[in-house]
């Protein structure tokens, strides 16, 4: 009886992980597609060219970055609950850090919103930023 229920528990856990991975993939795709919005694309090109952003472009990028950070925080929670394995989380964590490479706008967004995130997640983001601090130009 306990072997059967344990086996059933394993099935539910695998199904939960599969559903979680699907949810993560869909959320990632949504954020990626949102980043293809013409306003955001123009703004990203201006950032690359070191050109001044319009107010609309900056606001759009700030909202988009905040959505990305919230999605990553959700992945952090899923990892803590065992829905994401260590390798998947490690990959996501690295991707999170790349958002700050030579990007003072994203750094400013993070510094202004950090207190609204889970403290443990905030510490992870700060560690990822610290590893890339030599990419920031004054």
Which residues does each PLM region occupy?
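Single conserved hydrophobic/aromatic residue that forms the stacking wall/gate
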Residues: 1-12
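Amphipathic alpha-helical "stem/stalk" segments
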Residues: 17-138
């Amino acid at each position: 009886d306990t072997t059967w229920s344990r086996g059933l528990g394993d099935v539910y856990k695998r199904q939960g992980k599969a559903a979680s991975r699907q949810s993560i993939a869909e959320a990632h795709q949504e954020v990626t597609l949102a980043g293809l919005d013409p306003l955001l694309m123009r703004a990203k090109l201006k950032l690359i060219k070191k050109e001044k952003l319009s107010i609309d472009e900056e606001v759009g990028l700030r909202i988009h970055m905040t959505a990305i950070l919230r999605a990553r925080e959700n992945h952090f929670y899923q990892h803590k609950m065992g829905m994401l394995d260590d390798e998947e989380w490690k990959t996501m964590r690295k991707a999170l850090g790349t958002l700050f490479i030579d990007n003072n706008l994203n750094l400013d967004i993070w510094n202004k919103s950090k207190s609204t995130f889970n403290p443990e997640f905030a510490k992870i983001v700060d560690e990822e930023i610290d590893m890339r601090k030599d990419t920031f130009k004054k």
